[in-house]
Amino acid sequence: MRIGLVDVDGHNFPNLALMKLSAWHKCRGDTVEFADPAARRYDKVYMSKVFTFSRDCTDRYDCEVVRAGTGYRDYATILPEEIEHICPDYSLYGVKEAYGFLTRGCVNRCSWCVVPHKEGEVRAHADIEEFLDGHKHAVLLDNNVLASEWGLMQIEKIVRMGIRVDFNQGLDARRIARTPEIAALLARVKWIRFLRMAYDSRAMQDDVHKAIELLRKHGVPARRLFFYVLIRDDTEDALGRIRELKALGCQPFAQPYRDFEHEGKPSWEQWRLAYWCNRKPLFHSVDYEEYRKKRT
């Protein structure tokens, strides 16, 4: 069979589902490639979409086309077990690190997050060696690995193996703040670049400060602490959180709120604040009030 794959979001970040589908089909002797509607015919095409705001692919194929992913608001379709737990085909994107989940789900019920709707409660998913494939670096996509005993055991294993990792979706600062043993464990991890957390609301302030304090106490410098900062309607509140993190020596990254159930887009002010925060030369050289005056 000839299999075509379409990464609807683009190729800026490897699509894990497509890498697993590629590995499974290649094991069956099928030919797999990123689909080109002008180049050849396919027996089957898979289109995967992670983000609702990504423009859908309008290419037409004269074969069975499977569309799936959170970006299609499809929360029910999952990969069969034999595909879900296959080692991904990393050659598809030519990446140098492994990708995967140790756990799935989350214990939190954040109104802005799709994970509770799609995955439910946190649970064990895979051992790091299932998808490591000899790599010494791994990007882990867990949504709340610290809420899982299995997840904590896997982090211990990662430390023993000496693997460099990036928990790309962020770690829960509240669990770090309230469990000093977790802070001590994370300080033993080799990070690819940053230890990522989130500062989504002012209600998290005490926990965020405590997490930073504990991690610094165990030897993780503030400059290695990266925080996703959610920007909702109150941009002044988000600006305050961003400035707070900057003063502490941490790395804020602003994310304008998107309603995953509707088509609403972030406001101009949300975009402007995020642009200023995320362009680090600008962020470190110009105060936001000065920048805002120039961009009105």
Language model: regions and residue ranges:
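Short amphipathic alpha-helical segment that frequently serves as the phosphate-/nucleotide-binding helix
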Residues: 15-23, 152-156, 183, 209-212, ...
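Core AdoMet radical
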Residues: 5, 10, 46-49, 114-211, ...
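Short, charged, surface-exposed secondary-structure boundary motifs
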Residues: 15, 43-45, 57, 74-82, ...
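Short, well-ordered alpha-helix to beta-strand connector turns
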Residues: 29, 41-43, 61-63, 96-98, ...
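A structural motif corresponding to the C-terminal lobe/cap of the Radical SAM core domain
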Residues: 189-196, 203-296
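Charged phosphate-binding loop/patch that engages nucleotide di/tri-phosphates or the phosphate backbone
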Residues: 13-15, 23, 123, 285, ...
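N-terminal [4Fe-4S]-dependent radical SAM core
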Residues: 1-2, 54-55, 64-103, 107-137
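A short, structured N-terminal alpha-helical element that caps or precedes a catalytic domain
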Residues: 1-67, 72-74
